[in-house]
Amino acid sequence: MQKKTLSDVAIQGKRVLMRVDFNVPIDEEKNITDDKRIVEALPSIKKIIDGGGRLILMSHLGRPKGKVNAEFSLAPVAHRLSELLDTPVAMAKDCIGTEVMQAALALQDGEVMLLENLRFHAEEEANNPDFAKELASLGEIFVNDAFGTAHRAHASTEGITHYVPVAVAGYLIEKELNYLGKALDNPERPFVAILGGSKISGKIDVLENLFTKVDTVLIGGAMVFTFFKAQGLNVGNSLVEDNKLDLAQALLKQAADKGINLLLPDDVLVAATISSDASSHVEAVNSMSDGMIGVDIGPKTIEKYRNEILAARTVLWNGPMGVFEIDNFAEGTFAIAKALAEATSSGAITIVGGGDSAAAIAKAALSDSITHISTGGGASLEFLEGKALPGIEALND
C-alpha cells in the first residue's frame, strides 16, 4: 500500500497538524507510567521541528465519553514531551475554538503545541464533519502517525482528510505499512505465522486471510482446545468454544486443502485451577485428564515450534501461548519470544502484533531483538485480516 509520507512534503514554515497516539497510562499523581507511545512518535515530531515546521499535535486519552474531564487532560503528556524534546511544548486549552486557532497562527518555525484531548468532544468519535473541518482549519498539512487508531473512522483520522489539501503518513505508520504490508504482500519464505490467544472467534478472519499467504501456522493459547475437542479429544476443563467446533473442523480442512502446514501442540501444561499457587504438570494432548485445564504449551511443542520458527525467513506472531500473566504458566510464551529473537539474529524478519505478545516480548526484555513490534493492537489485527483501515485509506496516494 503506497501512501505519501512525511518525507514527500515540504514543511518549512508550514503549520503541520499531526494525529498521534498519546493514549498513555497515567497514575493518580498524574505521572505517566509508560511513555513508550510518546517515544515512538519522536522521529516524526523531530523531523517536523528540525525541518522548521510549526507543529500542532492532537491525540485522545482514555475514555472521557465526550465531556471535559480533568482526569483525562493531556497536560502531563505535554510536560513529558517537552522533557523528551528538551524544548517547550505549549498546552492548548481545547482542540478547537478561536483561542486555539489564534495560538496555532502564532506558532513560529520549530515550535510545538499539543491540543487538549480530542475525546472531550463527542463529535470526534462520531466523525462529525463540522468538527473535522474545524480541526483541519488549524493546519496546512495533515500527518497521521497514530496507527493504533487507524482502524477507526474518527474526525481526527478520517473526517479531517476531506478538508485538508495534503494528508500524509508519519514515520510510525510508514514503518507499520512497510513491515505488515510486506509480510502480507511479498514475504520472504518460508513464512510462519504463530497465533495464540483464548478464542478462535477472535482469530477466524486472520486465519482465513493468512491461509492465502503463509506456509506454516503454529497454534497456541486456549484456542487449541476448541480444535482438539473438534477432533474428538478429551480436553478436561479447558476453555472451549462449543459453538465453534464445526468452524474449527472447517479451518483444519481449509488449511489441508490449501497445503498449509497447520500445527497444533503435542503436549500441554495442565493445572486444576488457573491461579499462581496451582501445581501443574505436562500431559500429552491425546491423553488429557478429566478435570484439568490446559494453561500453556508443553516442552515437546515448544521444541517443535522453535524448530519451525528457526527455519523461517518471515515470522509473524499474534497472541500468547498460555496464561503468561501467571509466571508458572508463561514458559511457552517466553520460549516463543526467545525463538523469535534467535530467528531475528539469523536474519529472519520477525513481526509481533497484538498487545499481549508485545507485552510478553517486553517482559522477556527482548523488544530490541525483534524486527518490528506493531504499535496498534486492534489496527494490526484488522490489517492482518485484510481489512482496509479508514485512517490510512484516506491519506494521499
UniProtKB/Swiss-Prot annotation:
Places the protein is found: Cytoplasm
TM annotation in the entry: none
Keywords attached to this entry: ATP-binding, Cytoplasm, Glycolysis, Kinase, Nucleotide-binding, Transferase
EC number(s) from the headed UniProt entry: 2.7.2.3
Classification via PROSITE patterns: PGLYCERATE_KINASE (PS00111)
Quaternary organization: Monomer.
Protein name per its UniProtKB record: Phosphoglycerate kinase
Organism: Chlorobium phaeobacteroides (strain DSM 266 / SMG 266 / 2430)
Lineage: Bacteria, Pseudomonadati, Chlorobiota, Chlorobiia, Chlorobiales
